[in-house]
């Protein structure tokens, strides 16, 4: 049965396998893909010093940004396949799909360790067919890799296999450091499985298990000394003063609940969690594991998700909640399954499938109404040019779509202030374009769930030729960016959602 779930996941993941990255959180997808492209073109130098083709404020003179956060696994693993077969976008997607399949397998195996095989299949289905997994398990982002690594490390800790568990956890934290909190329950599971009875044995196993992840992380971070100065490193990320979302306001909780509920657990998952808490079936697991899982998830939410409230960061806690939900459904296995219960479960399953389809469609809908126009504008720009983009995010997506170095400007005041220096730094073009405004996790709040459900009947919105209601409005003739650029610069290309200008210095007033 679990193979059938994996096959169904592959069928859904095959949707637009070779297309551009335009779906939910495409900015982050294109950032990872850009790093991978540099690996495919430059080889080991782009692995040791990962980079992307957009520039950041304060570093405008440099036509790229060094990103020493996650290790570029998509680039490293995909490199030989791209050299042999080409098809870069297909290859990087297939790598994510492979690790999503690993994660489904690990959820199944973990549950089978504690429950019956049928419960393992339920958990694998809840996880593998969750809208968040169907989306982020197909795109070139590191989140499915780190989640699969976390689950793999936990499974091999239960066996117990110290070297392989340690290796999977090293992979997980190199893919994304944020999952380091889950080392606590993984190590706890290993120590319990090894039946450590003395403090000396406890310390020895802990040191042996943690040595590879610690040394690997230190080696990766130490390579920063050979990099050009960049704000995007593991060390600077950890040390950055960012208070994150307020715990006193409702916005953070609305995002978290919206992401975990219908985008994550679904109807059956939420019901299972309630059943697990009511029937206390989760107590079948060792109390020490439960306590450390609770602590690590609380720390992860407070330290990671509160600071970066984006949907892909939901995947690790979602995996543990799916396991909790499966314990809940397993609690019904010993009781009579009468007609009324069968009807109720059937209705819940039907509603779960409907909701999963709706919210998966929302995540996989294009956020760019005019990718063809953007690419056509890119064809008018000579190779190795530098382009200013009027854009609400940091510029990773335009760098891929235009195949140029880009610098994002977020307001007319910012553009006017920075323009003289940007021209000196070699920026010769300005591109204005409209994209969906909710490319971050904000659209997953509870206030948007009903709107998303209604989009089932408007699936064409956001595709070429179809206006979307939530587009940023930069290209309208009365929009501030257009009013600033029209008459100052030579217009090279203009459509409803894309306008390209040449920065001829003689035209600038």
Regions found by a protein language model. Give the residues of each.
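Transmembrane-helix motifs of polytopic, lipid-linked glycan transferases
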Residues: 91-115, 152
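Membrane-lumen/periplasm interface segments of specific transmembrane helices
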Residues: 193, 204-245, 258-269
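Hydrophobic, aromatic-rich transmembrane alpha-helices
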Residues: 191-192, 260-298
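Specific aromatic-rich, kink-prone transmembrane helix
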Residues: 104-109, 125-126, 145-164, 168, ...
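Short acidic/glycine- and proline-prone juxtamembrane loop motifs at membrane-interface regions
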Residues: 132-145, 310
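Signature aromatic-anchored transmembrane alpha helix within multi-pass, membrane-resident enzymes
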Residues: 1-8, 167, 210-214, 281-282, ...
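Short periplasmic/luminal acceptor-recognition loop of GT-C membrane glycosyltransferases, typified by
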Residues: 165, 367, 379-416, 423, ...
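Transmembrane alpha-helical segments
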Residues: 13-18, 179-180, 328-331, 341-368, ...
């Amino acid at each position: 049965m679990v193979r059938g779930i994996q096959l169904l996941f592959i069928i859904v993941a095959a949707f637009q396998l070779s297309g551009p990255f335009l779906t939910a959180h495409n900015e982050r997808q294109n950032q990872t893909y850009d790093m991978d492209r540099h690996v495919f073109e430059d080889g080991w130098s782009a692995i040791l010093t990962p980079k992307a083709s957009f520039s950041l404020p304060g570093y405008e003179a440099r036509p790229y940004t060094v990103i020493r956060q996650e290790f570029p696994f998509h680039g490293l693993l995909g490199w030989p396949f791209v050299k042999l077969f080409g098809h870069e976008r297909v290859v990087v997607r297939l790598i994510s799909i492979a690790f999503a399949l690993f994660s489904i397998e690990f959820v199944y195996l973990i549950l089978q360790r504690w429950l019956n095989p049928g419960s393992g299949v339920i958990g694998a289905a809840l996880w593998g067919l969750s809208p968040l997994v169907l989306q982020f398990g197909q795109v070139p982002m590191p989140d499915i890799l780190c989640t699969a690594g976390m689950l793999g490390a936990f499974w091999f800790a239960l066996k117990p296999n110290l070297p392989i568990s340690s290796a999977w956890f090293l992979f997980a934290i190199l893919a994304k450091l944020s999952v380091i909190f889950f080392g606590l329950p993984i190590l706890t599971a290993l120590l319990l499985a090894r039946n450590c009875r003395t403090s000396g044995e406890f310390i020895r196993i802990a040191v042996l298990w943690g040595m590879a992840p610690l040394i690997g992380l230190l080696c990766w971070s130490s390579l920063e000394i050979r990099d050009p100065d960049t704000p995007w490193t593991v060390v600077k990320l950890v040390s950055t003063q960012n208070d994150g979302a307020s715990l006193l306001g409702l916005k953070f909780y609305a995002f978290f609940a919206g992401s975990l509920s219908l985008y994550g657990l679904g109807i059956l998952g939420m019901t299972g969690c309630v059943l697990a808490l009511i029937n206390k079936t989760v107590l079948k697991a060792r109390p020490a594991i439960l306590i450390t899982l609770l602590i690590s998830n609380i720390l992860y939410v407070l330290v990671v998700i509160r600071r970066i409230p984006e949907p892909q960061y939901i995947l690790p806690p979602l995996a543990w909640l799916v396991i909790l939900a499966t314990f809940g459904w397993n609690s019904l296995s010993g009781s009579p399954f009468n007609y009324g219960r069968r009807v109720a479960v059937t209705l819940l399953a039907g509603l779960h499938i409907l909701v999963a389809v709706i919210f998966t469609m929302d995540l996989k809908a294009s956020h760019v109404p005019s990718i063809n126009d953007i690419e056509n504008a890119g064809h008018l720009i000579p190779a190795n040019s530098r382009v200013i983009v009027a854009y609400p995010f940091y510029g990773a997506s335009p760098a891929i779509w235009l195949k140029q170095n880009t610098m994002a400007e977020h307001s007319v005041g910012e553009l006017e202030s920075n323009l003289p220096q940007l021209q000196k730094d070699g920026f010769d073009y300005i591109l204005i374009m409209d994209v969906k405004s909710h490319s971050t996790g904000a659209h997953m709040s509870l206030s948007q769930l009903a709107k998303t459900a209604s989009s089932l009947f408007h699936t064409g919105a956001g595709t070429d030729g179809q206006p979307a209601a939530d587009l940023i409005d930069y290209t309208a003739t009365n929009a501030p960016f257009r009013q600033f650029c029209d008459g100052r610069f030579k217009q090279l290309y203009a459509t409803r959602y894309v306008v390209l200008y040449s920065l001829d210095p003689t035209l600038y007033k």
